[in-house]
């Protein structure tokens, strides 16, 4: 930390603590012209290497998005929405496409540095917003990784028990977990072992981990295609009538549930520093992986609801039991293999993204510099990667993290909403920078206020919908959001991004719709998730006040691009 000592020792010499906190919290990264080619280096002098092609990026996004849920969630939602679950996935997919358009623009604008939503919000807004986004995302990632590893352990045990010699002989602490101290603790050995193996793979290098992800993702995609093709011959179109037996509200509610089945395409944005041609490939990878996922989910929905009447679908393993009822038990075995492959890739990519986020904050000084170190020969953020594996391993090994699932998704929705807001804010900054050097212009402030109003309207509409309030209140909330969006559209001028990268169409309307729907979904989460958002935000602010503001590296405020060509160093 020696490089920051001089800065830290003088932190209170020129201003009060509050003024220093305010100045630090509100500073942001600058975005130089696209011609800047300054390389990003770690504290050890080494950098990541560019080894991911377009196909690797698409498989990365698909690997992160499609887990075991494709075999379970489809049937669970179909029990309420009926065959209309297809529309639920279509609506949720359309919403994710809008979010993906925002990610695609920003990944094209920041094509050479890791950080994703954290980096975008640091440049569009300020330092403390970026830190809060990171903390909310990271809590989701850590708990999610632990939960997925436990699910993977359970599926792996179930797959092993298909062999008669092993059936019933595998102890609980290897699979679902053995409860101790009245359920306060839940011992699981296999989950940390699986996490250790995947962490080891990720530490070996991006080429090796990408190869593992590609093989496992291809396996599960092939299995899903086999399921769709085999099931297509068993479809009875009479099962699709009535298409929405419980009305459109059940279909819409289903869309709010299945939305999270698409989460993962944003992982592509965090591979910016390891992509061979980031400005071209990142937007295509984000959109391409999402479209693949939408197609697969809709295909599974049509097959599942066509094979079995929705009212007879099983809650635990709907797809497997649907094929078993048709005498195709071999497909059920394939589904188990596909579930293991799906959970493996979801976990692998999740751990990968976590380490790159830690790397970004370590470089900026918001976390200890050890997180910014890159191994000189493996070219991976070794310390960050091992730390992510340890945190997930401890959580998965001794806690029943499944009980925390109801407070997840807060970070994801927060990240998506902030990214959409970043598109608008950066476009405003572009216009402002060309006309004035004053960052805090009234035009920029008015734009941010409109974004906040849209977010509040989305939350209000979500709460009214959740508690079945009069439709008038929902319409009023929508009306307020429409007015705020209209103000953004007619009173603001937006400059296209500098350079020849991808530009999100329909700005500011598309980002506004994203923010409204994301916060609408936020309102559907368990009330404890709302409490978690507030508590974590307060704690994160305290950590920033005590550590971040003093250790953030001012020299990193100038955005620096990594080399734009592949390196095999």
Swiss-Prot record:
The keyword Membrane applies. Expressed in roots, stems, flowers, and leaves. Its main location: plastid. Permease involved in the transport of the cationic amino acids. Residues 1-41 form a transit peptide. It is found in: Plastid, Chloroplast membrane. This is Cationic amino acid transporter 9, chloroplastic. One of its GO terms (cellular component) is plant-type vacuole. Keywords: Amino-acid transport, Chloroplast, Membrane, Plastid, Transit peptide, Transmembrane, Transmembrane helix, Transport.
